[in-house]
Amino acid sequence: MTRVLGIEGTAWCASAAVFDAETDAVFIDSDAYVPESGGIHPREAAEHMREAVPSVVEAALDHVESNWGDPADAIDAVAFSRGPGLGPCLRIAGTAARSLAGTLSCPLVGVNHMVAHLEIGRHRSGFESPVCLNASGANAHVLGYHNGRYRVLGETMDTGVGNAIDKFTRHVGWSHPGGPKVESHAEDGDYVELPYVVKGMDFSFSGIMSAAKQAYDDGTPVADVCCGLQETIFAMLAEVSERALSLTGADELVVGGGVAQNSRLQEMLTQMCENRGAAIYVPEPRFLRDNAGMIAVLGAKMYEAGDIISIPESGVRPDFRPDEVPVSWRDDEAVARPVPTDERRQGAEAVVDIDADGGRVTKRRLEKAYRHPVLDSRLRSQRTRSEARLTSEARRQGVPTPVVYDVDPDAGRLVFQYVGDADLKTALSESAVRDVGRHLAACHAAGFVHGDPTPRNVRVGEDRAFLIDFGLGYYTDAVEDYAMDLHVFEGALGGTADDPTAQITAFEDAYRSAGDGAVVDHLREIETRGRYQ
């Protein structure tokens, strides 16, 4: 059976581990860098890595020798984190891995750190094809497997979730890491309103941090700000995870990353999954924070698939995105599943009852138990009003949308005309995609965005495509906001379609022909903002 020694050194934690596939046992030895003040300084982190990596590797080798004898005979491969991360730290860990592989005369495996966060949860849960939420210091994204790669279904458009929280705690004067301190203070606080920024399945944290700092400076008790911070950020992560489950039809969620150690976040995600009838797996804390155990486990899967790397090709990649990794170790089904066609459907936000014979659809935005009641009530009412208003506005602009028959914002209830025969996810065609491009161009020309134009929010009829669910839409004259509409649609296509390239080209061509080409040009700039672009 396979036995792999893994080395982790992406940023702050020097770690070495041994994974024995026969027993599924994982030995981990770690030495984390703790700055004297402020956040992580790359030079100091690299100095720590230089001192700590040899000692954790030695501990791993001692473990091998005491259990299986000579490491040269007992170890099948050495795996290391190639990225993403801090370049100086990655290079130290990479050098150690190359040297050790040479000493042991065994193959070298280069692992993507973020995919390892996903795979350790999938490995230990036994899930077939889950959606994964990674919530760590420098990252926040939702992934799903499709056609040989993990696709980014949603991600932060600015800073990582942990780094965002740390920026607030440094402003307050607390030492690193800030997350546990926010969690502790939030227990004694009352909710305060902060910006809630979800765009399709992407999110942004910079505005929340600025508002939290301002609230603290204005005299709001720090415990209250911490409570508002947790309730807002973690509700965003839970909502986007639910949107990904709804988009793909998946019923499994795995969670990774150090921020996921937060008990309130785990509670929110568990409540969300229970309400959907989905299974959730949160690894034990030693596998959530940065660790070499996940590197060794994924390294073993890659080694068994023949996915090894030569020394000349083993350079580190500080900007190594998870969707760049060819997934050589699995060939099972994609995360995208068939969409139910029964008369009652559960989306990310609402339950929809369909009366096809009567030509009506009743949509109810249900209370979300995972969200703070004040936040939940505000979002449900706002989104119901926006959906009714913008659905009708789009129709006035010549965009095919359902007629709104009734609306009750306080109850989160709308009654619509039943339109289309299927949603775009199951009836994908170039002509329908072109319709979406033209429809969004018309909305933008009238000064508003859809907000969540995924394939699930497009209904396809015999001769046209209809836009539905404008709940995240709003009035705006910003090219940035128009381009985000395009980004959301293309990201959802990329995560669920077998070959999205032709559809994306048709979509952009149609948008350019009917709208402002500057929006498509701005889309290219937005695409550089995702983590490690």
Swiss-Prot record:
It catalyses: L-seryl-[protein] + ATP = O-phospho-L-seryl-[protein] + ADP + H(+); L-threonyl-[protein] + ATP = O-phospho-L-threonyl-[protein] + ADP + H(+); L-threonylcarbamoyladenylate + adenosine(37) in tRNA = N(6)-L-threonylcarbamoyladenosine(37) in tRNA + AMP + H(+). GO terms for biological process: tRNA threonylcarbamoyladenosine modification. Its cofactor is Fe(2+). Residues 338-533 form the Protein kinase domain. Fe cation binds at residues 113, 117, 290. InterPro entries: Aminoglycoside_PTrfase, ATPase_NBD, Bud32, Gcp-like_dom, KAE1/TsaD, Kae1_archaea_euk, Kinase-like_dom_sf, tRNA_threonyl_synthase/kinase. Binds 1 Fe(2+) ion per subunit. In the N-terminal section; belongs to the KAE1 / TsaD family. In the C-terminal section; belongs to the protein kinase superfamily. Tyr protein kinase family. BUD32 subfamily. HAMAP family: Kae1, Kae1_Bud32_arch. Required for the formation of a threonylcarbamoyl group on adenosine at position 37 (t(6)A37) in tRNAs that read codons beginning with adenine. Is a component of the KEOPS complex that is probably involved in the transfer of the threonylcarbamoyl moiety of threonylcarbamoyl-AMP (TC-AMP) to the N6 group of A37. The Kae1 domain likely plays a direct catalytic role in this reaction. The Bud32 domain probably displays kinase activity that regulates Kae1 function. This is Probable bifunctional tRNA threonylcarbamoyladenosine biosynthesis protein. The lineage of its organism: Archaea, Methanobacteriati, Methanobacteriota, Stenosarchaea group, Halobacteria.
